[in-house]
Amino acid sequence: MKRDFISILDWTSKEIRDNLDFAAELKQQTKEGKCPQLLKRKTYGLFFHKPSLRTRLSFEVGIAQLGGTSLVLSEQDFKIGERETVSDVARVMSRYVDGILIRTFSHQMVLDLAQHATVPVVNMLTDFNHPCQVMSDMLTIKENLGHIDNVRIAYIGDSNNMTISWLNLAARIPLDLRIATAPETMPDMKLVSEIQEIGISTIKVTNSAQEAVEGAEVLYTDVWASMGEKDKIAERELVLKDFQINSSLLKYAEKNAIVMHCLPAERGKEITDEVIECAQSVVFDQAENRLHVQKAILVQLEKWRTV
C-alpha cells in the first residue's frame, strides 16, 4: 500500500515511535560498520527547489548506505507546474523511481505530487512544515533524556515551518510545548487551538522567552528569517531581539537542559556562539540524526508499498 511522509500527521503515534526505534537501530549498525542493504536496487528522485546542505547530503548518503541510488534534480532541471503539470510529473516519475523526495517552497505542490504519484512522496521541507527534521529532533531528545513523552520544550523565536512541525507532533506525542515569540510573529492560533483540543499535549504561547524557558528540558530555536524572506530580516531582528537563546536565558531552564537548532544558524542573532558551542548543545547530533531517521522513513515506506 502506497503511503507518504508529508506531515507528521500522516503517521500514527505508534508508527512514529516504532520508526524512532528503528532509526536508533540503524544508527547503531552504522557505527558498527554494518549497512543492511534494505534499499538495494531502489532508485529515488530527489527534487530541490531550495538550496540544501544537510538535506541533500543526509538523504543521498543514507540511500547509498542502504544500497539504493539517488537521482538529484534542481529547479534548473525541471519546472513542475510550468513546462509540465504536477500530475504529469508525478505519474511519469512513478514509472521510473521507487520514491519521490522534494524540498520546495509550496506545500500544495507536494500534496499534489502525492495525490497523483503511485510511489511514496517524502516532504524534505516546505514553507509549511519540516517533518523529517522534527523526527530527527525527537531521536536526539530520546538519546539525551531517555524518553519523548511530556518533554518540556521551549521553542524560542520566529513562528515558521518548524513551529508548525512541533505543533503537529504534539497531536501525536504528548508534549509540554511552550512557544515564545513576539506579538508580530505569533503562530496560527487556530492550529494551536486544534492541537490543544486533541488533549494529549499542553501548548502555551507567550511573548516572554523567560516564561517559556523556566523549567524547560529542551530549548529550541531556528533562524528568524527563513529562506526566501531576505526582505524581512531587518524587521525580524528588531521584533525578535528579546528572543535570542543566550547564556542568560539558559539559566532559567533545567540544569541539564539541552539546546537545539535545526541549522543553518545565524550565530549572534537567534542563538549566540557561546550557547551553540556549549556542552548542553546537541545541534550537531540533530544534524547527524537526520541521516538515520530518514533511512528509517524510506525503509518503512518501501515496506508499506510492497504489502
Please identify what each model-predicted range represents.
Residues 1-57, 61:
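Positively charged, low-complexity intrinsically disordered leader regions
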Residues 98-169, 261:
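Anion-binding alpha/beta catalytic cores of soluble intermediary-metabolism enzymes, centered on
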Residues 196-274:
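Rossmann-like adenosine-cofactor binding region
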Residues 256-257, 263-307:
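Adenosine-phosphate binding glycine-rich loop
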